[in-house]
């Protein structure tokens, strides 16, 4: 068994008790009075992933600079990963860009709720509500959701945490990793531009001077390029893979427990296909994302993961493809397309 890194030990010391406290709170017998709901399903999964009598399995963390093969997750800096990517380095493990300085003012819950109201105050938003019996997200008026978030989740009192997974990015400049500006990572934006020109009959390299109307064809790839996420403390999302390909997510505030399946052999993936987000792998490892951390999940790889929110959190993220692995990415896309149960989002129609 490889020796644990200092970073792994520090993470377990810093967050192990916090995670266990949240799990005990979720297991409170009072919550069983809610009947059969999404919350009950989530508790069943959490109890299987993290049995009460075991320590939290923190991932083996290693520096990307050493290309440590025995690490579950690489950690790096913005400068180091940008330099490596410029030399055609291929990322093959989940990687965290550590504690970026976001350079933003007004961060926090109030700022987020004000932005949500400014953008969508008279609209509806998709909400994962664990107090319902439906797996599908519930469409709720934004004003009601804002009120519920302001009230705050209180698991012992029966106010269960909600999850907003289908938000547009609310801002001007998303905090994407700088290396994504390299030409090899321009695959999805280029596809989007080409297909938009094909479907509209207007191949114009510039801003549109008029509204775009597309008949009988949905233009939906852009929605994958950037997105925003919000979840309250205790919100849980079961195991899934991201579609269409690689993902980056930056934690703007809060705390997230990211849980990875460590054994993705053929028999486990068959179970995953059959069970979807009810699947629990034989073994897992986890990391805690802190404010400013950016998690990058590599292109062309199937990385089943689940997420538990440790503190009210907002994330910004996006999707990308790597031209150096484009054939493998297409294989991944095809694999997901015939196994839709493994992803919590549909493949953009423009890629089908």
Annotated model-derived regions:
Residues 1-296, 304-352:
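N-terminal accessory scaffold of Fe(II)-dependent oxygenases
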């Amino acid at each position: 068994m490889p020796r644990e890194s200092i970073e792994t030990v520090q993470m377990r010391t810093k967050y192990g008790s916090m995670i266990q406290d949240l799990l005990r709170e979720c297991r409170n017998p009072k919550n069983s009075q809610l009947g059969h709901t999404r919350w009950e399903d989530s508790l069943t999964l959490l109890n299987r992933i993290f049995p009460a009598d075991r320590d939290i399995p923190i991932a083996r963390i290693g520096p990307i600079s050493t290309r440590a093969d025995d690490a579950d997750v690489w950690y790096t800096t913005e400068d180091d990963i940008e330099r490596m990517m410029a030399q055609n380095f291929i990322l093959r493990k989940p990687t965290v860009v550590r504690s970026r300085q976001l350079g933003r003012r007004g961060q926090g819950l109030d700022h987020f709720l004000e932005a949500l109201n400014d953008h969508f105050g008279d609209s509806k938003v998709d909400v994962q509500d664990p107090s319902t019996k439906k797996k599908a997200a519930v469409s709720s008026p934004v004003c009601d959701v804002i009120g519920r978030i302001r009230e705050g989740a209180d698991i012992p009192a029966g106010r269960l945490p909600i999850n907003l997974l289908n938000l547009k990015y609310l801002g001007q400049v998303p905090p994407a990793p700088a290396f994504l500006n390299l030409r090899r990572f321009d695959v999805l934006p280029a596809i989007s531009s080409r297909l938009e020109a094909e479907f509209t009959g207007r191949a114009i390299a510039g801003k549109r001077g008029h509204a775009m109307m597309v008949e009988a064809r949905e233009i939906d790839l852009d929605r994958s390029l950037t997105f925003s996420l919000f979840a309250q403390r205790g919100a849980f999302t079961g195991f899934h893979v991201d579609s269409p390909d690689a993902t980056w997510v930056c934690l703007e505030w809060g705390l997230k427990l990211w849980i990875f399946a460590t054994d993705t052999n053929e028999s486990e993936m068959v179970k995953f296909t059959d069970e979807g987000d009810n699947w629990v792998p034989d073994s897992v490892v986890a990391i805690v994302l802190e404010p400013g951390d950016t998690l990058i999940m590599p292109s062309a790889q199937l990385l089943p993961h689940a997420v538990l929110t440790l503190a009210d959190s907002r994330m910004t993220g996006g999707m990308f493809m790597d031209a150096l692995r484009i054939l493998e990415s297409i294989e991944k896309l095809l694999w997901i397309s015939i196994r839709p149960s493994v992803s919590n989002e549909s493949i953009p129609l423009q890629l089908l």
